[in-house]
Structures are given as structure tokens and as C-alpha cells.
Design a protein with these regions (language model features):
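Active-site-proximal, Lys/Arg-enriched surface segment
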Residues: 72-162
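Short, well-ordered, mixed-charge alpha-helical segments that flank or form enzyme active sites
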Residues: 113-116, 151-152, 162-167, 219-222, ...
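Gly/serine-rich nucleotide phosphate-binding loop at the start of the catalytic core
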Residues: 1-78
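Domain-level cores of phosphate- or acyl-group-handling catalytic modules
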Residues: 173-250
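Electropositive, glycine- and tryptophan-enriched low-complexity nucleic-acid-binding patches
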Residues: 65, 130-207
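Short, conserved catalytic/metal-binding motifs centered on acidic residues
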Residues: 37-38, 51-53, 66, 101-115, ...
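Conserved small/polar residues in nucleotide/adenosyl-binding loops
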Residues: 256-257
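Short, charged/polar micro-motifs that form catalytic or ligand-binding hotspots
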Residues: 24, 56, 129-133, 185-188, ...
Length: 258
């Protein structure tokens, strides 16, 4: 299994992608070695803590080096996952289907639950659409690419509450020109606007699709027209609103008349 991870890293040039996303170190063990170790542990169900407790940890780096790399505020993980997804789609997936197949972007959000948020940065009370009540944690907004048979996750972001009154955890100050500042600003952006940021990142790395799929939570006229201006059509659930009119049979009609 670890050999499979190594072949995947070599085939998709993961080290170069990390470097393009500022995942670098000044000296010592290479970042790609740290990342390969982390990914290998996930697939084999191991952890650094248990390896150190049992004496089976044989890597040439310390715990502090490993966690400094994972917690670095300078690595653009959102762009990294987008670049990796684009490499997989463009070099492995697209060759398996013909040009007439319609590709899509799929956007959805889910609850990232936390039992306590008092010490979690930007931890919030967020609305769970499944249970129809507020819970502690974040909303996880995810963008995926699909050709109808294969689903490839592209990027994602954690969304805190856009209302400061619903934020439970600490709020740290960062320069908005830095990557850390931009990520925290994105986390406090409303979901329809954050969706456009994820789409723009996916398009900027060479991914493309014919349609964008999402539910009624994102189907606002502003977002639909913005997506259409990027050369894609929208397939979505209609939002129940008396203020929104839809064109049907050449006439503007409300949701209740469709």
C-alpha cells in the first residue's frame, strides 16, 4: 500500500505541486516526505502518536517538524488540492471518455460538528439543514468534478458563521494580504459567495465543466448569472422566494406558478 502511495506521488508530481503552493521548507527533510508519511498513515490506519508509544517510529524527522509542516499558514492547500485534482482529471480520467460526455461541477455543504468551540478559532453556531437547528462547528463547503461515472473532490473550505454574534471561538487578527488572512476572510463569507471562490480556483488550474450542480441554498440569481458568464449552465433546485421570478414560456412567473 505504501508503494502505491509512492507511485501516486511520482506520477502526479506531488512534490512540484506542493512547491507551487508554497509548501516548502528552508532545510532538513523535504515537505513531500512529510506529506507522504501523513497520507500513508491514513491508508494503513496508523498515527505518529501510537508509533512513538510502541517504539515503531523510524522516520528521520521529529514530531515538531511534522506538525509545523501541517500547521503552516503559508501553504495554500486549497490551490494544492485543485491542482492535484486537475492533474488527475486531465491526465487519467478524460482519456477514458469521449468528447461528447458532459462534465459537471458539484457543490454541496455538510456539517463539520464540534462538541466544543471555545478554543477553536472561529468555531461557530451554524445551522444544520438536516436537523433544522443550530449546532456547534463549521459548515464544510465542498466542490467536486464528475463525468457521470467518476467523482473527484477538487477543493473545500470550512465556513464559520457570517454573523459575529454566532462565533463562539477566538477570532485572531491577520493581515488580509496574507494567505492566512484570506482564508479567514473566506471562512466568514456567506456560502454562495464562497462557492464562487472555489469555482474560480478550480477554473484557474485548468479544470472545466459544462454544468454546475447545487441545491436551492445556492440558487440565487446573482450566482446563476455569474456562473453563466463563465461559460457554464446551472442545474439546481429552485429557491422558494416570492421575490424571484423565473422565465417560463417567455413570461416571468413565480415559484408557486411553475
Amino acid at each position: 500500500l505504501i508503494d502505491c502511495v509512492q507511485r501516486f506521488f511520482s506520477k502526479h508530481h506531488v512534490g512540484k505541486l506542493l512547491a507551487r503552493c508554497n509548501g516548502m521548507k528552508e532545510k532538513g527533510v523535504s515537505p513531500v516526505s512529510l506529506f507522504r508519511y501523513k497520507l500513508s498513515n491514513i491508508f494503513v490506519g496508523r498515527s505518529m502518536y501510537m508509533q512513538q508509544q510502541t517504539g515503531s517510529f523510524k522516520e528521520a524527522f521529529s514530531k515538531n517538524t511534522f506538525y509545523r509542516f501541517l500547521n503552516s499558514a503559508k501553504t495554500n492547500w486549497l490551490r494544492f488540492t485543485s491542482l492535484l485534482a486537475a492533474d488527475i482529471v486531465n491526465h487519467d480520467i478524460k482519456g477514458l471518455t469521449n468528447d461528447s460526455r458532459k462534465n459537471v461541477f458539484i457543490i454541496d455543504d455538510s456539517l463539520f460538528n464540534r462538541t466544543s468551540c471555545k478554543k477553536t478559532e472561529l468555531g461557530s453556531k451554524v445551522f444544520d439543514h438536516t436537523d433544522m437547528r443550530f449546532k456547534k462547528g463549521f459548515r464544510m463547503l465542498t466542490l467536486s468534478w464528475s463525468d457521470g461515472n467518476t467523482l473527484i473532490p477538487v477543493n473545500s473550505c470550512l465556513l464559520a458563521s457570517a454573523k459575529t454574534t454566532n462565533i463562539i471561538g477566538p477570532v485572531k487578527d491577520f493581515d488580509n494580504r496574507t494567505l492566512a488572512g484570506k482564508r479567514r476572510k473566506l471562512a466568514q463569507t456567506k456560502a454562495p459567495e464562497a462557492m464562487m471562490a472555489l469555482l474560480d480556483t478550480a477554473l484557474s488550474v485548468g479544470l472545466n465543466a459544462d454544468y454546475v450542480l447545487f441545491d436551492s441554498w445556492f440558487s440565487n440569481p446573482v450566482q446563476i448569472t455569474a456562473i453563466h458568464s463563465k461559460g457554464m449552465d446551472v442545474i439546481a433546485m429552485i429557491k422558494k422566494s416570492s421575490r424571484i421570478k423565473y422565465s417560463y414560456g417567455g413570461k416571468p412567473v413565480s415559484y408557486t406558478h411553475l
